[in-house]
A protein has these predicted regions:
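Extended, low-polarity segments enriched in aliphatic/aromatic residues
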Residues: 2-61, 66-79, 84-295
Length: 295
């Protein structure tokens, strides 16, 4: 059965500001019916790539976290590391980026946990019941360790998925680095030779012996490679790369099945704001003008 969707516009006046309006919306939509008492509550959001200003302000996260804490819950803000090079590729840089963009205990009232760990390989394989494109989703461990899951996102364009919102925030956002590779890539990783220093880290972490060091450079044997993506996470020079060759249709199908893996069988609540609808996702280190006004 389809869930009810509750809507409130972004108009405000001196009687009620937008944070108060969001609190009223959460109450009306039944978020208060969830048993938060002594529960670990993951609030999944995007902290924004440094340089981007379209991400949701920390004030929104604080409103949600306060709602949870008032009902005895233990909220934390979370996201997983990125597959590409940037300010959120590992947990240390990711947390620095989050704090640079205003997220922290003082501003949001709760802690930050990067769900897939230091290098993006702390994951749980979650069976996707009825999955056609994904049989076992690779999800950041802290996401699955949480008792309650809340997604907080804003709508925006996306150059591959078309648009990004609740599903992309959950499906792609909760995937570990290997999970993101599975969604974006139809094949297996390769080594960019000019970046490789022949350190052998990829070979050490591979359970299948796929990376081979030849003449001081790594080469991946695709007959042995199973596409787990651990070599991408471990490479100190970002030399192990994917082809980004999955079709848009299959990418969206995989995102949907990854989302199913995250939300199945536990209390969830989803908040989407049609605000700062930038043409590209918040993973960019810049944001263009919104393509539509706030709703």
């Amino acid at each position: 059965m389809a869930s009810k969707v509750y809507f409130a516009d972004l108009r405000a006046d001196y009687h009620e500001n937008l944070q108060q309006k969001l609190t009223r919306l959460m109450k009306t939509a039944g978020m208060g019916d969830i048993d938060f008492q002594d529960k670990y509550v993951a609030i999944k959001l995007h902290f924004g790539e440094p340089g981007n200003l379209a991400f949701l302000r920390p004030n929104w996260a604080k409103t949600v976290a306060d709602f949870v804490k008032e009902r005895g819950g233990k909220p934390f803000l979370t996201d997983c590391n990125t597959l590409y090079v940037g300010g959120r590729k590992n947990a240390l840089d990711h947390m620095d980026s989050a704090m640079l963009n205003g997220f922290g205990p003082m501003t949001t009232g709760c802690q930050i946990i990067i769900a897939d760990g230091l290098k993006g390989n702390d994951e749980v394989e979650v069976p996707v019941v009825g999955g056609e494109y994904v049989k076992n989703a690779k999800i950041g461990r802290a996401v699955m360790d949480a008792d309650v899951f809340i997604s907080l996102t804003h709508f925006k364009g996306h150059e591959e998925a078309g648009f990004g919102g609740c599903l992309k925030n959950i499906g792609m956002g909760c995937g570990s680095r290997a999970g993101k590779m599975e969604q974006h890539n139809a094949g297996k990783p390769h080594v960019k030779q000019k970046l490789c220093i022949g350190c052998g880290q990829c070979r050490k972490i591979c359970a299948h012996g796929a990376p081979i060091i030849t003449d001081g450079k790594a080469v991946i044997d695709h007959d042995r490679c199973v596409g787990c993506g651990r070599c991408i996470a471990i490479c100190p020079k970002n030399a192990v790369q994917i082809n980004w060759d999955e079709s848009a249709a299959n990418l969206n199908r995989k995102i949907a099945e990854y989302t199913k893996a995250v939300v199945d069988g536990r209390p969830c609540f989803h908040i989407s704001l049609v605000i700062d609808v930038s043409p590209n996702c918040d993973c960019h280190a810049e944001n263009d003008m919104p393509i539509v006004p706030n709703v």
